[in-house]
Design a protein with these regions (language model features):
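Pre-Walker A-like glycine/lysine-rich segment at the N-terminus of P-loop NTPase domains
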Residues: 1-45, 56-62
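A broad, structure-centric signal for solvent-exposed, well-ordered loop/edge residues
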Residues: 12, 25, 31, 199, ...
């Protein structure tokens, strides 16, 4: 894959070939982190974007239902996630006031006027491309801390990935962006920006604190927590991912074992690094070992898959 940046952060222009393990070298403060952040943002903003758009619409839909149930003093009941999402995905951008009103009144104890439903339908029928552009811009803006553009340039910023002879491009302005997509992004990216995020696995009520993390750190820890929770709830979950990982990522696992010689032990909800019969709380292992512990957890829980992007 060829990854190209123009007028982004500290970078005027960059053309990088990503093939297997790619090492980017350079002096301090010349834009190496900008490349990593751009790659992370590009993949995660565009990966499975149709589902993300449907989730945005689903959230608006649920808020509408709850506000009308509350306003009519009807006891609130749990929303049927599968039902609302199925309805939204089946309609795409072709919602009608009549169909939405019918669905609401048949599935929930509410009565709504056509005028109220019309305002909801306006949101639901927003073009996919407009929603995607807004989502991608916000994601880049968040990761880049509000400084996407090269401050020494007045031109448009752009990020392009050329994959399988096709290209996906994001054109970025100060307050908006435009996505031109030829090839779907089918893999996630993970950025181990700070090895000390490993400590969050052993914090009480960690989910509550995740919002305080930057997107890169939150992305890694959230994925590990979710995958492990799925395994804890159902020991038969993630079997396919685990089998594929063991088969196709075996070489990586062998290399990892040279640095991460021990094993991970989970006891009473806490993670430990176990070596020579001694268990060390993840929070007490060295910074270097923490990075390898994160990779080990991502592999063993099926988070990190073949062709996913791992940025260190």
């Amino acid at each position: 894959m060829d990854f190209k940046l123009k007028d982004l952060g500290k970078i005027k222009k960059a053309d990088i070939k990503l093939d297997g393990i790619t090492v980017i070298c350079g002096d301090n403060n010349t834009g190496k982190s900008t490349i990593g952040k751009s790659l992370f943002s590009f993949y995660n903003a565009l990966y499975d974007y149709k589902t993300k758009i449907s989730m945005q619409k689903d959230s608006r839909f649920k808020n509408f239902i709850l506000s009308n149930i509350n306003s009519m003093d009807v006891p609130v009941r749990l929303l049927d996630n599968d039902s609302t999402m199925s309805f939204i995905t089946s309609q795409a951008e072709d919602f009608s006031v009549e169909d939405v009103k019918k669905y609401l009144e048949e599935n929930y104890p509410i009565k709504v006027t056509k005028n109220k439903v019309a305002s909801l339908v306006e949101y639901l029928n927003l073009p996919e491309k407009d929603i995607l552009n807004e989502y991608v811009f916000r994601y880049f803006n968040l990761v880049m801390n509000g400084q996407i553009k090269n401050l020494n340039s007045t031109g448009k910023s752009s990020v392009t990935a050329e994959i399988k002879g096709k290209s996906d491009t994001i054109l970025l302005n100060k307050k908006s962006c435009s996505c031109e997509l030829d090839e779907p992004i089918e893999h996630s990216a993970y950025y181990i920006n700070n090895p000390f995020v490993l400590d969050w696995l052993n914090l009480t009520n960690v989910s509550w604190f995740l919002s305080a993390l930057n997107p890169m750190d939150r992305n890694v820890i959230s994925a590990i927590i979710k995958a492990q929770a799925d395994i804890n709830e159902d020991s038969m979950s993630n079997i396919l991912e685990t089998v594929i990982n063991k088969k196709e990522l075996d070489e990586i696992r062998k290399v990892l074992k040279r640095a991460y010689a021990g094993d991970t032990v989970i006891s009473h909800g806490k993670y430990y690094y176990s070596e020579n019969g001694v268990d060390f709380d993840f929070r007490n292992i060295s910074a270097g070992l923490k990075s390898f512990a994160l990779i080990e957890r991502m592999l063993e829980t099926g988070v990190l898959k073949k062709k996913d992007i791992l940025i260190l």
